């Protein structure tokens, strides 16, 4: 019989961060509860060799190419389901824990059978008293997603039934994935967690935020550079994926009665971003943002996800 939880880490050229995350999980969490699956997304820096040398006991999946966050995690999730694990913990590699979040999150799902998934409170790595991600929601009027990070949110002591949970760290009940499907690989990167949350909820499940479990996040390590280029620190492709996937999400899950205001508000937002990028000379970002908007509006959504 497998252990209860498969912990899934998707690595892409970040072996040092991944190793630190693994060490913290091994140190603080009950090792009898989980196995760790490292999915390497076509790293070019020898990540797989580095990690497997230090942690030979882990399970490794070599994707050979960068399949994106969504499909990279799907490879680990499919292995978890096929191997008979009850739960899967999807967790970013640039995170650390200093408590047993595996048992905390698992106990919560055991106590709430209607919940398909649960996330902990996530704090900034560099400021461990400041919340990076709290209860997540969707403003249907404006057509934007959000996460509550105000100081008073930290005072929550009971779980919240929320609209979506972040892919930074989610414990998911595998049986619900068999019903609703895995991440939508068409999204590749960004909004795949929001879309899956809404799909799980459309099947009658709940998704929860558990403030009594916590972890720490570096945030966006694979999407930013340590040195500033003509395009700044942020990878230009982030503008492409976030704009395209945001619009796809609105087309699928937005409320038609609010569409006029959604499009007016977001058109204004994207025009402001385009103007800012143009003034800063970030021409590649301008081009990719326009491409993302165009594809979001006009590319058919195939809504591909594996079903078991």
Residue ranges, per PLM feature:
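Short, acidic, metal-binding catalytic loop of nucleotide-sugar glycosyltransferases
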Residues: 23-33
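A conserved acidic beta->alpha catalytic loop
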Residues: 24, 40-49, 65
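Glycine-rich, basic loop-to-helix element that forms the pyrophosphate-binding segment
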Residues: 62-83
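Short beta-strand-to-loop acidic/aromatic patch adjacent to the donor-nucleotide binding site
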Residues: 85-96
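Conserved donor NDP-sugar-binding/catalytic core segment of glycosyltransferases
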Residues: 96-132, 138
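Short, flexible, basic/aromatic active-site loop/helix in glycosyltransferases
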Residues: 138-163
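A short, conserved alpha-helix in the catalytic core of glycosyltransferases
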Residues: 163-172, 176-182, 186-216
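Non-catalytic, C-terminal membrane-associated alpha-helical segments of glycosyltransferases
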Residues: 255-308
């Amino acid at each position: 019989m497998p252990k209860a939880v498969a912990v899934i880490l998707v690595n892409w050229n970040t072996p040092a961060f991944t190793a630190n995350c693994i060490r913290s999980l091994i140190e603080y969490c009950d090792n009898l509860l989980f196995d760790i699956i490292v999915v390497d997304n076509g790293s070019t820096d020898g990540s797989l060799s580095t990690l497997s040398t230090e942690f030979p006991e882990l399970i490794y999946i070599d994707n050979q190419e960068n399949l994106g966050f969504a499909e990279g995690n799907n490879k680990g999730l499919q292995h978890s389901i096929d191997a008979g694990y009850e739960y899967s913990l999807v967790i970013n590699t640039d995170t650390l824990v200093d408590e047993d979040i595996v048992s905390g999150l698992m106990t919560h799902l055991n106590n709430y059978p209607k919940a398909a998934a649960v996330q902990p409170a996530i704090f900034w790595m560099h400021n461990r008293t400041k919340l990076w991600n709290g209860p997540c929601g969707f403003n249907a009027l404006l057509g934007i997603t959000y996460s509550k990070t105000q100081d008073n949110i930290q005072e929550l002591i009971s779980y919240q039934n929320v609209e979506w949970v972040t892919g930074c760290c989610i414990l998911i009940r595998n049986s619900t994935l068999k019903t609703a499907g895995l991440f939508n690989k068409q999204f590749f990167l960004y909004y795949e967690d929001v879309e899956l949350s809404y799909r799980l909820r459309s099947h009658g499940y709940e998704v929860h935020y558990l403030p009594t479990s916590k972890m720490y996040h570096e945030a966006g390590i694979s999407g930013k550079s340590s040195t500033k280029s003509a395009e700044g620190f942020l990878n230009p492709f982030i503008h492409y994926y976030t704009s395209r996937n945001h619009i796809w999400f609105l087309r699928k899950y937005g409320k038609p009665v609010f569409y006029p205001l959604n499009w007016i508000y977001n058109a204004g937002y994207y025009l402001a971003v385009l103007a800012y990028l143009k003034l800063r000379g970030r021409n590649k970002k301008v081009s990719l943002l326009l491409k993302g908007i165009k594809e979001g509006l006009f590319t058919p959504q195939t809504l591909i996800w594996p079903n078991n």
